[in-house]
Amino acid sequence: MVLTGNELWSKVQQALQHNLSKPTFETWIRPAICSGFRDGELTLIAPNSFASNWLRKNYVQTIEAAAAKIYGQPVRVSVQAQEEDSAERVLPPMASAPVPLPAAEATTASAAPSSGPRRILPGLNLRYVFNRFVVGPNSRMAHAAALAVAEAPGREFNPLFICGGVGLGKTHLMQAIGHYRLEINPEAKVAYVSTETFTNDLIQAIRKDGMQAFRDRYRATDLILVDDIQFIEGKEYTQEEFFHTFNALHEAGRQIVIASDRPPSQIPKLQERLISRFSMGLIADIQSPDLETRMAILQKKAEQERMMLPRDLIQYIAGRFTSNIRELEGALTRAVAFASITGLPMTVESVAPMLDPNGQGVDVTPQQVIDKVSEVFDVTPQDMRSSSRRRAVSHARQVGMYLMRQGTDLSLPRIGETFGGKDHTTVMYAIEQVEKRLSSDPQLASQVRRVRDLLQIDSRRRR
């Protein structure tokens, strides 16, 4: 059979698409391109060195077998890496008004197909699967690493440490790993737990003299997914217990996946031995998505809601909300709800006033609150997180807690953790003090308004 390299690779891809899971195919096989076919050797180019190494280790034999079957002769496969460029993705054309999608089309955004009943553990969100994760340059490395861990737990990257800002998809990827393993083995012992839950379970075990049961529970897992590990900072006993849990699981070859808003080395008051353990596998960073990725995220969200939106509206929302995916999807949800309630068409002109920063306001990150309050009150972010009782620092810290309660979805305990481990009663007191002083202290009111303006927090927002 006479085939060019591109023709052979296209046929191999078609064959493998039926034999591999969709996440595997879309992550490893589809992005690879053929750069040549000579003397029985098919040369493939992967997007980056990470992908090329994974293809060589795990899929070269599968590709060679498929190629030989199609070509009629043995085929050798070599894989090279090409660093990813910023090629622009092109979105398909969209209608100028919202149109419900047929039910059959809407199924394309569903979770990965299941071959039978599956066991979903408490805490795993059914929406957080690989098929629903939109991959962009900001998240390609983390997504590929997560899929690699899901396919071969305990082998390549253990632990896998995913870090990135609020609302960028860390929890989605973590839980997608859990869902994937449960698809492969419904009896797998998968545990998804926040650091807060781990700490609370530990406290209860100490109180009830149940430490052995606590250890047995966590160390019997095949896969443990630990979210928000940054909140372990300063908790010496929790760190001690987590260190031994980590060692027990790692020595048994069990996969550990950890998520944080910052790399291990930047978590304050974290034991050096934990920093070392967390860094011994792979640290995968997720950045804020670029415009094209944000547009793709909105389009997929619209498909899941069975709506087609005007391209200019997608572009407007993607350009307006830039810091994280959570606020991006929230803006789309508000826009769809607004159009449904008012009966107005889904156009930029109709929804822009509702999404204006002087109206509802947008979500901000805890770090943004700390940075802007520090700027206005002339203190440092380190001062804000410290235990300093200097009047200027104390007042700035209280305002930071007050605005963090207004501008984020963090609970009182989480806000306290962000400010260096303060408890929730301290946060409540700070909020009450600021609310009292705002009506009688014009200078404070002016400073708070300035921070609000910088953060685009509306004074009418919740809490």
From Swiss-Prot:
Gene3D superfamilies: 1.10.1750.10, 1.10.8.60, 3.30.300.180, P-loop containing nucleotide triphosphate hydrolases (3.40.50.300). It holds the Pfam family DnaA_N. It comes from the Bacteria. Keywords: ATP-binding, Cytoplasm, DNA replication, DNA-binding, Lipid-binding, Nucleotide-binding. PROSITE patterns: DNAA. ATP binds at G167, G169, K170, T171. InterPro entries: AAA+_ATPase, Chromosome_initiator_DnaA, Chromosome_initiator_DnaA-like, Chromosome_initiator_DnaA_CS, DnaA_C, DnaA_dom, DnaA_N_dom, DnaA_N_sf. NCBIfam families: DnaA. Domain I is involved in oligomerization and binding regulators, domain II is flexibile and of varying length in different bacteria, domain III forms the AAA+ region, while domain IV binds dsDNA. This is Chromosomal replication initiator protein DnaA.
